[in-house]
């Protein structure tokens, strides 16, 4: 299917989530979807773990300190088959907009770092999970499986893909997306401290600037613009922000309160050739970053270097992707033979259709 729309407006969220509060998180999600819809956007991109906020506290606490926060975080994470998710899908439908949404997904007793791409009809086009939680994130989240790996979907606005955080740095994930002909990418980022917090021997890769743009007087080798250049995609980089109240909610008793500004101002949008297309947001900016996308502007970049096509040698180098779900327990398919298989999307209820639109679909 060729894109129906080659030129359209898109938005990346640069805002504070509803920390530890599922209902507030959903309200803010619908608010920004409505805002993007009012501004005639066809795509809105949310940060990693937007619902119920990225648990940055796990980088700063010991085991005992983590327990109350972990319990509250689990209680306010999102079931995919839930009234809350249906309200978000209805908002996408009411605004006729594609939504890339990052959330902490509850699946039985486990949590996953999940993204879904919602269509303007409110259907789930893609459901993926971060393939490997980063470092201390494994305190909270499990890993994705084979059928939650693919990140790119053909849509009416082009081949749209999304990845979480350091997946955008993973050369194998980039190669996979490039092989699928990705045109528009959502590099979803969490809450991240700035370089002023860096202490030896912590690597520079673990601060925000290393992931949002290049340093002055240094090579443009950093994560998000590099993704745009290497894949030849429009790359939207939504980021979370935090206020003083958010700092209090994420800080255990007895710990010093940080300056929220060290975390803010990192939202970006890059052209297929790596140019930054939007002014850097102010530290106190809460809102949407907008970009006008023209899919025809991708052609010349990819004509020089299409690593999913003419500029690759699959006879020499190939990537093996196993897209099958791996279940702990499998059962026999007595009708068709072999093993009975249920996709993760089916199992968590994301293939269920929405009910007919209601008059209150757009209410925040």
UniProtKB/Swiss-Prot annotation:
Keywords of this entry: Hydrolase, Lyase
Domain of life the protein comes from: Eukaryota
Explain what induces or represses this protein's expression. By cyanide.
> Which family is this protein grouped under?
Belongs to the carbon-nitrogen hydrolase superfamily. Nitrilase family.
Oligomeric state and interaction partners are given as: Oligomer of dimers, forming left-handed helical fibers.
Keyword Hydrolase in the entry? The reply is yes
Organism, as annotated: Emericella nidulans (strain FGSC A4 / ATCC 38163 / CBS 112.46 / NRRL 194 / M139) (Aspergillus nidulans)
Q: What SUPFAM superfamilies would the database entry show?
A: Carbon-nitrogen hydrolase
What's the pH dependence, according to the entry?
Answer: Optimum pH is 5-6.5. Active fom pH 5 to pH 9.
Q: Name one GO molecular function term.
A: cyanide hydratase activity
Residue numbers annotated as active site: 48, 130, 165
Question: Which Gene3D superfamilies does UniProt cross-reference here?
Answer: Carbon-nitrogen hydrolase (3.60.110.10)
Q: Does the keyword Secreted apply?
A: no
Q: PANTHER family attached here?
A: CYANIDE HYDRATASE, NITRILASE
Query: In its UniProt entry, what is this protein called?
Result: Cyanide hydratase
The EC number of this protein is 4.2.1.66
- What biological-process GO terms show up in the record? cyanide catabolic process
Reaction(s) catalysed (UniProt annotation): formamide = hydrogen cyanide + H2O
By its UniProt entry, which InterPro entries does this protein fall under?
C-N_Hydrolase, C-N_Hydrolase_sf, CN_hydrolase, Nitrilases_CHs
**Role noted for this protein:** Catalyzes the hydration of cyanide to formamide. Degradation of cyanide may be important for plant pathogenic fungi in infection of cyanogenic plants.
Q: If you read the UniProt record, what top EC class would you report for this enzyme, in one word?
A: lyase
Q: Can you tell me where the transmembrane regions are?
A: none
């Amino acid at each position: 299917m060729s894109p129906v729309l080659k030129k359209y407006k898109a938005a990346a969220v640069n805002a504070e989530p509803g920390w530890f509060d599922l209902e507030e998180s959903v309200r803010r999600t619908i608010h920004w979807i409505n805002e993007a819809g009012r501004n005639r956007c066809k795509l809105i991109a949310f940060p990693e773990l937007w619902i119920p906020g990225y648990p940055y506290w796990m980088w700063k606490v010991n085991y005992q300190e983590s327990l109350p926060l972990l319990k509250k975080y689990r209680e306010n994470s999102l079931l995919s088959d839930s009234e809350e998710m249906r309200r978000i899908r209805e908002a996408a439908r009411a605004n006729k907009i594609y939504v890339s949404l990052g959330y902490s997904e509850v699946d039985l007793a486990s949590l996953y770092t999940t993204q879904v791409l919602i269509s303007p009809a409110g259907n789930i086009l893609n459901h993926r999970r971060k393939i490997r939680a980063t470092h201390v994130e494994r305190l909270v989240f499990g890993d994705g499986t084979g059928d939650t790996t693919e990140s790119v979907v053909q849509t009416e606005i082009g081949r749209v893909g999304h990845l979480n955080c350091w997946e955008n740095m993973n050369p194998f994930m980039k190669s996979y997306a490039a092989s699928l002909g990705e045109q528009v990418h959502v590099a979803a980022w969490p809450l991240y401290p700035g370089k002023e917090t860096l202490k030896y021997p912590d690597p520079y890769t673990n601060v925000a600037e290393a992931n949002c743009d290049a340093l002055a007087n240094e090579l443009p080798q950093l994560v998000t613009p590099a993704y745009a250049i290497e894949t030849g995609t429009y790359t939207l980089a939504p980021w979370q922000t935090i206020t003083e109240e958010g700092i209090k909610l994420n800080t255990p008793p007895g710990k010093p309160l940080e300056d929220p500004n060290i975390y803010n101002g990192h939202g970006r949008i890059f052209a297929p050739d790596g140019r930054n297309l939007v002014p850097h947001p102010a530290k106190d900016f809460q809102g949407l970053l907008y970009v006008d996308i023209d899919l025809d502007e991708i052609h010349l970049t990819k004509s020089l270097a299409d690593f999913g096509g003419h500029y690759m040698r699959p006879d020499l180098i190939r990537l093996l992707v196993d897209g099958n779900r791996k279940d702990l327990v499998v059962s026999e398919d007595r009708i068709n033979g072999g093993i009975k298989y249920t996709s993760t999307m089916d199992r968590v209820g994301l293939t269920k259709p929405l009910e007919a639109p209601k008059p209150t679909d757009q209410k925040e």
